[in-house]
């Protein structure tokens, strides 16, 4: 079971908007839920994945529809900035979590099953640059 205290959540048009603030370069576009689990290194859009995890937890705990959003601090005050996720596969910007729920949770369960499967050997990522700011580089010795 996941638990997380959210930075902020606000009510928006009848749904709850889960907001996560980020300081890095903005990444709001993705190519469908599958891309969140198959990308490697810099192509893996962990901020979007993390925000969908928050949306999943909020949806499950409150039983309401949730819109995941990312506020990138360096861009959020610019005219026309939108914190909404932009799914290029479906062509939907600002989708509610329920659009992704079934497939997202299926892929998440598969990812967690692989992570805890002792028959699957640990592999370091191929791009060592990815490890520069990783919290776990001490564990994998990179």
Regions found by a protein language model. Give the residues of each.
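RecB-family 4Fe-4S metal-dependent nuclease core
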Residues: 1-142
């Amino acid at each position: 079971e996941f638990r997380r205290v959210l930075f902020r959540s606000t009510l928006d048009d009848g749904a709850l908007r889960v907001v996560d603030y980020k300081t890095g370069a903005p990444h709001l576009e993705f190519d469908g839920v599958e891309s969140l689990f198959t990308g490697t290194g810099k192509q893996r859009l962990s901020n979007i994945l993390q925000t969908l995890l928050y949306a999943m937890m909020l949806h499950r705990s409150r039983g309401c529809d949730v819109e995941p959003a990312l506020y990138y601090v360096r861009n959020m005050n610019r005219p026309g900035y939108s914190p909404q996720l932009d799914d290029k596969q479906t062509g939907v910007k600002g989708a509610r979590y329920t659009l992704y729920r079934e497939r997202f949770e299926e892929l998440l369960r598969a990812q967690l099953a692989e992570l805890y499967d002792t028959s699957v050997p640990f592999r370091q990522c191929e791009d060592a640059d990815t490890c520069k700011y990783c919290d776990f580089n001490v564990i994998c010795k990179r």
